[in-house]
């Protein structure tokens, strides 16, 4: 368990908390428990117990509080990708696999503020395309155009050719993302404490294809051998980059993102709650 929290940065949800009721509740609970709260300057006048702060100040807070579902948390991780802060997701969404506590969170939130919580570290992947590097916490998906034929590509691991494929695409997933799109494509569920990357084909032409788990430290190289239309790579289902024939994706493991957890066995409890 960690030490008592000294400062939190609150990332408001302008869609699901448009009246700032939940944001004010979080700031008020922090104030009542001796914890400073900061929020972006633009919305500081809407939150009584939070001070306005710059992006750098938000990024350097001890803990970043995110209101919403898994998608909102992923967006915050992308926005603050180089932070050393821990992320706490408060679930106002649907599935809530990454978020830790529900919106009626008073007791659990006070517990966390007083230092009674754990940290789980989640591997990210860095994807380099044509000199630009992108980061994903869940997955990177190379996929065909919506109206085109299959995309063709080759896969190499650690400099060694593994296979060539014609498919609707391929998902390169972290263990955290193994319960997301990769799972829908038939990929395995991988405990997030395992440092590995999962390769799962999407509707491959070869029906004998199987997912492959690659250990941390081995570079994965995807070479696009045939792509038409708006074939693209998506990162965590949000950022999209178009690709063309001849493009090469170099994928390596990146830094770890810290998520706040109330329970040490959160992963298997969440599996039981959400999937079984």
Feature roles, as predicted:
Residues 95-168:
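Catalytic core of DAGKc-family lipid kinases
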